[in-house]
Amino acid sequence: MKTITITSIPGFDEWREASRECIAKRIPPEHIILQSAHSVQEDLFGSGDEQCESKRPRSNLSIPKSTVMLLKYALCHNDENRFALCYRVLWRVVYENRQLIQMKTDDDVIQLFAMAKAVKRDAYKMSAFLRFREISLEGQEHFVAWYEPEHFSLELKLDFFQTRFKNMRWSIL
């Protein structure tokens, strides 16, 4: 059993790298424990984290861009099982049914779309309703806003704020 701990938030890049290596080694989802760093529990027998370090060159997976984007949004959800669900769906797309995402009655696909929808809604609310207040900090203008997202959606909207407010000093707390 492989245990992989994702330490970054939301963890897409780290998850993608670990998933590529595990898919290349054909490790089925039921033989992997994917968890976030803040949900790590001590193993009863103390076996530490293992990485899927592949001895052979990484295979070039060809996954539809729409599937990758769906996984990226779902990985921003706050559900602790998001990494395992996304790996299970990726495994099924690669080894079982390349058109899995079009199967709207599949339980994993339903859950994946629901998670992505919740994250998109959260990200939309941030860009639509977030309001900055001007403060003076060391004699300079600074704009501060407070937002508490339900999911890890802040990274998805950083580009929006950087381009919209590129000439301002701002912070989102």
Residue ranges and their predicted role:
Residues M1-L173:
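Extended, well-folded catalytic/binding cores that form a central cleft or groove in large enzyme
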